[in-house]
A protein has these predicted regions:
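Short acidic, Gly/Pro-enriched loop/turn segments at secondary-structure junctions
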Residues: 3, 14-28, 130-143
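Residues located in well-ordered beta-strands
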Residues: 9, 14, 125-127
């Protein structure tokens, strides 16, 4: 079934590996409009899937990035879902059994990053970010290189947007407007 979803309608992107010989290449994407909507999968067997995945990722950054920065500047929070399940549960996700997943939330504000797992990180202490799609783990580091928070890249929905926002916040320290 074909359905058109405009880029601005995509709220969550999940990138992962599929197939036996993918090594560290994230070759598959799933996306959804919101938490109550179904996931749509782009598998590597679709012609030009790699280009389509990059376009969707980049369009999310272009559309949601400025919105998220404005929300943060207005003293709001931007939420990201993440998975803390075992690999067997993640396999349910990969097979399309999305109802079996237990999503948790990260809440990012201009001042803090808070997680459902009880992590509380003051943004002013974050001086570096490491990781990304070529790395297994995203780490927020203090000025001495000590990890303040980490999350597996493949467990964080819209991980590229999260990374872009943190990088921007490190470089620009968002002033709060009221």
């Amino acid at each position: 079934k074909n359905k058109f979803i405009p880029f601005e309608g995509i709220s969550d992107i999940y990138r992962y590996r599929s197939g036996k010989y993918t090594r560290k290449i994230l070759n598959t994407m799933a996306f959804r409009e919101n938490i109550d909507k179904p996931w749509y999968k782009i598998s590597p067997n679709i012609a030009h899937a790699d280009r389509l995945i990059e376009v969707i990722k980049n369009e999310q950054l272009l559309f949601r990035g400025p919105q998220a920065l404005n929300t943060l500047a207005q003293d709001g929070t931007v939420s990201f879902s993440y998975l803390t399940e075992s690999k067997s549960k993640i396999r349910h996700f990969l097979r399309g059994n999305f109802l079996m997943m237990n999503e948790k939330k990260l809440r990012l504000s201009a001042r803090t990053l808070d997680s459902d797992d009880g992590h509380h990180v003051p943004i002013e202490e974050v001086h570096f970010i490491s990781g990304g799609s070529n790395s297994q783990t995203i780490k927020l580091l203090d000025m001495h290189g000590r990890a303040l928070f980490s999350v597996p890249y493949t467990s964080l929905f819209s991980a590229d947007l999260f990374i872009a926002l943190i990088e921007h916040m490190i470089q620009n320290r968002i002033p709060i407007r009221r």
